Every structure is written in C-alpha cells, then in structure tokens.
C-alpha cells in the first residue's frame, strides 16, 4: 500500500525549497482556492501545499489534504519567532504541544487558550517527533523541542513575548501550527510541526523575518525531507 504524506507550509517561500529538494514531477491540483502539488517519491505519494498565512487558511488546507487526498501523516515545515534565549536564528524546533494563544474566553471563567469541549494544549505525534529526534541525532543536528504558540497576529513586542512564555511556557510563536495539529488530532492523523527560527518576535522581528525567511525555510525543508526519507 502506497503511503500518503501531506507536507504543509504557510507561505510560498516555505514550500518552494521542499518542491525543489524532492526533485520529482508534481501534478498541480487546484482545490478550495489553493494548489496542491501531488507527486511520487521513493514509492510514497506526497502532497505539498502552502496554506497562506493564519489559522483559518491552514485549517482549510489541512482538512483538504486529509479528506480530498487521504494523507495518512501531516508534516508542517516553516519558520517561527523565538521566545526564549536558547533558540537562535536558524535553530530547529519540533512542537511537542501547541496552543492557540489568541483564544480568550476568560469572561466565562475559562483559562486563556481554552475552548469548551477542547483543551488548552494540542498534542502532536509522539512517533513522528521521535523520528525527528532520530534524524537529528544521525545528522548531528541540534533539534530543540517545546511548546509552540499560534495566533492570528505577527508577534513583535517584548511584552507579548513575555506573556506567551509566562502563560503557556511557549518556546516559539507562529500563526498556523496549532490549527494544523488540531485538525489532525480530530481526524486521527499523525502530525509533526517543525519550525526553523527566523526572528526573535521582538521590535526588530519584521526586519529579521524578511532577512532570514529564505534561509530558515531551507533549513526546515531539508530536515523535513530527511524525515520523509525515513518514513
């Protein structure tokens, strides 16, 4: 049986190196306002797409991958802002848990990040995370692990950084991972969210992001391909 693997990024810049690294002929399939790139790599069917920025877009794209293309695993590759001192530009981080940091139902006495009939933290796949660690060890790459906070805002202030660390013990922040992991969890599809650090989520974040986006995206993409090679 051919294994079907979904590979996601948020932006075109995040999937361009992925498409180039796999080096196969991809069929382009339009669906739901997006384009999915379908190809065969080492007897594995891979579906690659960028969702566009934000939780709504990434939810739509992940759901499409699962329901329309039948992917059995989802790997997310992209960039994020660091919230902690030991995560530097171009470092790699795999999410053990994710949280929607902009969810606030505290008016109803719910903790921040919590939605009724759900949970604050969204788990990722233990087996895929273990594979990521194995690949990192084999390649002598330092792979950090931690909580990633996702929200529909580009974080670029010290105050917000400090809040995300104190409230959620988050190591990095981005805009899609939690929604991708949530969809996968609900459909029972193993998910791994891999991020390379592009900025420090501070007042200089917009300039740092632009400067390091391409390099950080390539770092994440190369590591993701190594994971696919082992699946």
From Swiss-Prot:
Active site: 14, 199
Record carries keyword Hydrolase: yes
Keyword Iron: no
EC supergroup of this enzyme: hydrolase
GO molecular function, a single term: adenosylhomocysteine nucleosidase activity
One cellular-component annotation, GO: cytosol
Enzyme Commission numbers on file: 3.2.2.30, 3.2.2.9
GO biological process terms, semicolon-separated: L-methionine salvage from methylthioadenosine; L-methionine salvage from S-adenosylmethionine; menaquinone biosynthetic process; nucleoside catabolic process
Coiled-coil positions: none
Catalytic activity: 6-amino-6-deoxyfutalosine + H2O = dehypoxanthine futalosine + adenine; S-adenosyl-L-homocysteine + H2O = S-(5-deoxy-D-ribos-5-yl)-L-homocysteine + adenine; S-methyl-5'-thioadenosine + H2O = 5-(methylsulfanyl)-D-ribose + adenine; 5'-deoxyadenosine + H2O = 5-deoxy-D-ribose + adenine
Pathway participation: Quinol/quinone metabolism; menaquinone biosynthesis; Amino-acid biosynthesis; L-methionine biosynthesis via salvage pathway; S-methyl-5-thio-alpha-D-ribose 1-phosphate from S-methyl-5'-thioadenosine (hydrolase route): step 1/2
Record field: transmembrane: none
Residues at which substrate binds: 81, 155, 175-176
Covalent S-S links between cysteines: none
Keywords in alphabetical order: Amino-acid biosynthesis, Hydrolase, Menaquinone biosynthesis, Methionine biosynthesis
NCBIfam families recorded: MTA_SAH-Nsdase (TIGR01704), PRK05584.1 (NF004079)
Sequence similarity: Belongs to the PNP/UDP phosphorylase family.
Subunit structure as annotated in this protein's UniProt entry: Homodimer.
Function: Catalyzes the direct conversion of aminodeoxyfutalosine (AFL) into dehypoxanthine futalosine (DHFL) and adenine via the hydrolysis of the N-glycosidic bond; this reaction seems to represent an essential step in the menaquinone biosynthesis pathway in Helicobacter species. Can also probably catalyzes the hydrolysis of 5'-methylthioadenosine (MTA) and S-adenosylhomocysteine (SAH) to adenine and the corresponding thioribose, 5'-methylthioribose and S-ribosylhomocysteine, respectively.
Identification of the protein by name: Aminodeoxyfutalosine nucleosidase
């Amino acid at each position: 049986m051919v294994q079907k693997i979904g590979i996601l990024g948020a932006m075109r810049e995040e999937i361009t190196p992925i498409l180039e690294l796999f080096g196969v002929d991809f069929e382009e399939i339009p669906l739901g306002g997006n384009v999915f790139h379908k190809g065969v790599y080492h007897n594995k069917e891979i579906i690659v797409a960028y969702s566009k920025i934000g939780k709504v877009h990434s939810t739509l794209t992940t759901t499409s991958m699962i329901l329309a293309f039948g992917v059995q695993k989802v790997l997310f590759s992209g960039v994020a802002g660091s919230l902690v001192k030991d995560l530097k530009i171009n470092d790699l981080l795999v999410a053990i848990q994710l949280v929607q940091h902009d969810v606030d139902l505290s008016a109803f006495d719910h903790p921040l990040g919590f939605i009724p009939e759900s949970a604050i933290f969204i788990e990722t796949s233990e087996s895929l995370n273990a594979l990521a660690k194995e690949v990192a060890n084999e390649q002598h790459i330092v792979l950090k692990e931690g909580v990633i906070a996702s929200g529909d805002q580009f974080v670029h202030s010290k105050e917000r950084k400090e809040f995300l660390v104190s409230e959620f013990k988050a190591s990095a922040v981005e805009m899609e991972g939690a929604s991708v992991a949530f969809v996968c969890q609900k459909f029972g599809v193993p998910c791994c969210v891999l991020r390379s650090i592009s900025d420090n989520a501070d007042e200089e974040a917009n300039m740092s992001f632009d400067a390091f986006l391409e390099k950080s995206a390539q770092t994440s993409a190369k590591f993701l391909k190594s994971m696919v090679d082992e699946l």
